[in-house]
Amino acid sequence: MEEGGGGVRSLVPGGPVLLVLCGLLEASGGGRALPQLSDDIPFRVNWPGTEFSLPTTGVLYKEDNYVIMTTAHKEKYKCILPLVTSGDEEEEKDYKGPNPRELLEPLFKQSSCSYRIESYWTYEVCHGKHIRQYHEEKETGQKINIHEYYLGNMLAKNLLFEKEREAEEKEKSNEIPTKNIEGQMTPYYPVGMGNGTPCSLKQNRPRSSTVMYICHPESKHEILSVAEVTTCEYEVVILTPLLCSHPKYRFRASPVNDIFCQSLPGSPFKPLTLRQLEQQEEILRVPFRRNKEEDLQSTKEERFPAIHKSIAIGSQPVLTVGTTHISKLTDDQLIKEFLSGSYCFRGGVGWWKYEFCYGKHVHQYHEDKDSGKTSVVVGTWNQEEHIEWAKKNTARAYHLQDDGTQTVRMVSHFYGNGDICDITDKPRQVTVKLKCKESDSPHAVTVYMLEPHSCQYILGVESPVICKILDTADENGLLSLPN
């Protein structure tokens, strides 16, 4: 709990408020049915004293929607509760406007496309037509080479009609599908797309996608996210203002709703026990503030050993990005274990996860509680093959400092002889790029994987720890323990 605006604010929806009302107070309805509080809605308890006026804007209040609360010290309060749900339900019931498909029709008719640009891939959603993922490279002579995958095309009329009919039936039965968007369950309208580029990992079955349109009044049909939910099956979330006129698809913010507990004659404006609790809390805050900065780093490392954050989400070729916080090993020990291959980096978002063991292998895998672990060898280490590769490629890249000196910026290693690729009939192979990364956290590691060509991968590993060993790289980019 914390003080704010003349009242006590709940930091967790429902919980602290109910703790105050139930732990300190005893409720009485005076013969009426007690109003219900929902755990899904955040509340803030205010103690305005004996005289105050109810708000006339925002959430609706009625004088008869209250409970009488009595504390253990016989202090009495009349707590007026907000009416938070009835308005939305009535609006949904009375709605007679266009259905969601009709609301989106202008977007499908005007042949517009939305784009999302990421570090390597660009995603193109042409509404009602197709979803494309592509990367453009300029070759010698300014020739542009395009590497692309279609993640889905508009389904045939009969299949599309079936999906629309299912969506309309769900709407009539109030079963609007929802998706967790930034912690809030948000309604969406689904549009299916199939017949995409064949997927080698699924016996050349075509890629398919579900486009999820959600209401956002200030949006311009932006692509919020692209995610591969299972192998070669994708979810694309589009923000659009067109659905916002439909009450069932409208984005609903979760404002903090005020409860006003008015003291009755003979009672203080705020319960004695609550005031004592706040005084104790204020005393505890002072040493907490003093120790906060000292403990912050160690607390993060001990309590959050593996946090993954996506910065390039979307498809099979853009495989993964992850951030890992390493436990408190000394730098020397960590470097030694990393170079020996005994400390491996693992990460990934979506269906596939990835494992990189320096000087050993790069694996791609999926774990399922029913079918077990499916693993694909992306590449294995062979020093002689790498040295041959280094003769034709840049194994050691430099950065020119302001004083004219050069430092190693990145080293690249070749891992070949992976599992045979269904598309090329050749072994998979991967180039591992190790880079120095400045970070506030000395133990932060970023791992990402790309697939610029079929079954030819790039694995990036960036960390402040690598900064300490890059300058040990020889002409072939091979690393060793620093002196």
UniProtKB/Swiss-Prot annotation:
Sorted UniProt keywords: Disulfide bond, Endoplasmic reticulum, Glycoprotein, Repeat, Signal
Post-translational modification: Isoform 1 and isoform 2 are N-glycosylated.
Keyword hit for Transcription: no
Entry-linked Pfam families: PRKCSH
MRH domain location: 111-246, 342-469
Documented effect of changing residue 428 to A: Abolishes interaction with SEL1L
Main subcellular location: endoplasmic reticulum
Glycan-bearing residues: 195
Annotated signal peptide: 1-33
InterPro entries: Man6P_isomerase_rcpt-bd_dom_sf, MRH_dom, OS-9-like, OS9-like_dom
PROSITE patterns, per database record: MRH
Subcellular location: Endoplasmic reticulum lumen
Gene Ontology molecular functions: unfolded protein binding
GO CC annotation terms, alphabetical: endoplasmic reticulum lumen; endoplasmic reticulum quality control compartment
GO BP term, example: negative regulation of retrograde protein transport, ER to cytosol
Disulfide-bonded cysteines: 113-126, 199-232, 215-244, 344-357, 421-455, 436-467
Tagged with keyword Glycoprotein: yes
Subunit structure: May form a complex with OS9, HSPA5, SYVN1, and SEL1L with which it interacts directly. Interacts (via PRKCSH 2 domain) with KREMEN2 (when glycosylated). Interacts with HSPA5.
UniProt protein name: Endoplasmic reticulum lectin 1
Species of origin: Homo sapiens
